[in-house]
């Protein structure tokens, strides 16, 4: 039985920098928080436990990256260089590039290679205090390759000190062998892929890319209906490039989240509020593809829709492995406040996964997953660009990452 009192710390237990304790302690037993609060109120039952002095550092919940595509083969830096030289995305696609090139590389990679490539993208997130990650499939687009991606995602959670939740995104794009036959491909997703992967226990949620260049409302709803037959929660890539009504559809199905949302309108915001659907904003993609349409943050505030922030880490539109950078981008590009972005990577991000009862906040009865920061103010988490701020990561009461000793 391991018992530890973490003390001499400043605590932000709910991810809200307006709700903090300046001199706090956390009592942890066998990886679970049994008490936390003002150090002066530490119960006598814990007074004799071994102590871990954090020297006045800030402690927040472990960060949650709630929308990633971390598992894939290859990268597309050469295409990035082509686009900078003026080659259009359409021309790159005609040359066999774009998402098809990632599908090709992912299908060709074996599990060991895919694991190594994906682990290299996960490790920087862990070093920034991330203890929970969502990972989507969607670059295999056939049963064997989607299975391989989800198996690798599960392995990352088993071999790294991070909790991984998997999302089946078979309806991400149309694979080359189904060109011109989108409905037939959705048949494959709903009738072959999802049943097999769900039966194997590889799927925690189901996503769909509902967009003019993705799948229609009708096709998206078929995927949602299939997910519901397996009692799997749903989420949606919606209103990124146009307002197609995807968010309203997601809300009707009580989606955990709707993500991107640059073209979201008031009716969609109202539907999200009614359904309890979280808005996941992805500033990395907005920045990388030079979008100009801002997500409707004022509407989301007015309707009190919870807003999460994530990396959207992927090879084509957001090759990002820094959640702290996304916090900075959300403040500078989207005009979000520091409290909004910190909750956006803690409590609201956990809610976007349907896991607010487990992650995103620190309280008695929950796993002792937290990040320790070398900062004077929590605003620094969104302020610095490229500066390593995380001194220590604690998962289930054990230090799993240390950058430097606190003093």
UniProtKB/Swiss-Prot annotation:
This protein's pathway: Amino-acid degradation; L-histidine degradation into L-glutamate; N-formimidoyl-L-glutamate from L-histidine: step 3/3
Keyword Metal-binding attributed: yes
Keyword annotations of the record: Cytoplasm, Histidine metabolism, Hydrolase, Iron, Metal-binding, Zinc
Zinc-finger found in the keyword field: no
Reaction catalyzed: 4-imidazolone-5-propanoate + H2O = N-formimidoyl-L-glutamate
Top-rank EC class of the record's enzyme: hydrolase
GO cellular component terms, A-Z: cytoplasm
Residue positions binding N-formimidoyl-L-glutamate: 139, 314, 316
Co-factor requirement: Zn(2+); Fe(3+)
Enzyme Commission number(s): 3.5.2.7
GO biological process: L-histidine catabolic process to glutamate and formamide; L-histidine catabolic process to glutamate and formate
Any one Gene Ontology molecular-function term assigned to this protein's record: iron ion binding
InterPro entries: Amidohydro-rel (IPR006680), HutI (IPR005920), Metal-dep_hydrolase_composite (IPR011059), Metal_Hydrolase (IPR032466)
Pfam families in UniProt: Amidohydro_1
CDD domains for the chain: Imidazolone-5PH
Residues involved in 4-imidazolone-5-propanoate binding: 76, 139, 172, 240, 317
Residues where Fe(3+) binds: 67, 69, 237, 312
Family: Belongs to the metallo-dependent hydrolases superfamily. HutI family.
HAMAP family referenced in this protein's UniProt entry, alphabetically: HutI
Record NCBIfam families: hutI
Role played: Catalyzes the hydrolytic cleavage of the carbon-nitrogen bond in imidazolone-5-propanoate to yield N-formimidoyl-L-glutamate. It is the third step in the universal histidine degradation pathway.
Protein name from the UniProt record: Imidazolonepropionase
Originating organism: Paraburkholderia phytofirmans (strain DSM 17436 / LMG 22146 / PsJN)
Lineage: Bacteria, Pseudomonadati, Pseudomonadota, Betaproteobacteria, Burkholderiales
């Amino acid at each position: 039985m391991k018992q530890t009192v973490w003390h001499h710390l400043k605590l932000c237990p709910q991810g809200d920098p307006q709700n903090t304790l300046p001199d706090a302690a956390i009592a942890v037993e066998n990886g679970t928080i049994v008490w936390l609060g003002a150090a002066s109120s530490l119960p006598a039952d814990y007074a004799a436990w071994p102590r871990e002095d954090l020297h006045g550092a800030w402690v927040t919940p472990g960060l949650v990256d709630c929308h990633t595509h971390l598992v894939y083969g290859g990268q597309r830096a050469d295409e990035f260089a082509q686009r900078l030289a003026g080659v259009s995305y359409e021309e790159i696609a005609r040359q066999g590039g774009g998402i098809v090139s990632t599908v090709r590389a992912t299908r060709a990679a074996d599990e060991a290679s895919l694991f190594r490539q994906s682990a290299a993208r996960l490790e920087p997130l862990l070093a920034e205090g991330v203890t929970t990650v969502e990972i989507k499939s969607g670059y295999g687009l056939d049963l064997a390759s989607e299975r391989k991606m989800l198996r690798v995602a599960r392995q990352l959670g088993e071999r790294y000190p991070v909790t991984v939740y998997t999302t089946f995104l078979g309806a991400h794009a149309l694979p080359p062998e189904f060109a011109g036959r989108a409905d037939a491909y959705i048949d494959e997703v709903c009738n072959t892929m999802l049943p097999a992967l769900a039966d194997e226990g590889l799927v925690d949620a189901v996503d769909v890319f509902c967009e003019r260049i993705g799948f229609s409302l009708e096709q998206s709803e078929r995927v949602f209906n299939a997910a519901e037959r397996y009692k799997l929660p749903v989420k949606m890539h919606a209103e990124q490039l146009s307002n197609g009504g995807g968010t309203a559809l997601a809300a009707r199905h009580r989606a955990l989240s709707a993500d991107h949302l640059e073209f979201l309108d008031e009716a969609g915001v109202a539907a999200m509020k009614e359904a309890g659907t979280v808005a996941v904003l992805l500033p990395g993609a907005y920045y990388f593809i030079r979008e100009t349409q801002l997500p409707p943050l004022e509407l989301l505030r007015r309707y009190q829709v919870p807003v999460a922030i994530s990396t959207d880490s992927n090879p084509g539109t957001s090759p990002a492995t820094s959640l702290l950078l996304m916090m900075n981008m959300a403040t500078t590009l989207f005009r979000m406040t520091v409290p909004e972005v910190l909750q956006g990577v803690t409590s609201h991000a956990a809610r976007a996964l349907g896991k607010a009862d487990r992650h995103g906040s620190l309280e008695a009865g929950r796993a002792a997953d937290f990040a320790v920061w070398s900062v004077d103010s929590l605003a620094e988490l969104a302020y610095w660009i490229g500066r390593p701020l995380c001194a220590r990561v604690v998962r289930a009461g054990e230090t799993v990452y240390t950058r430097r000793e606190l003093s």
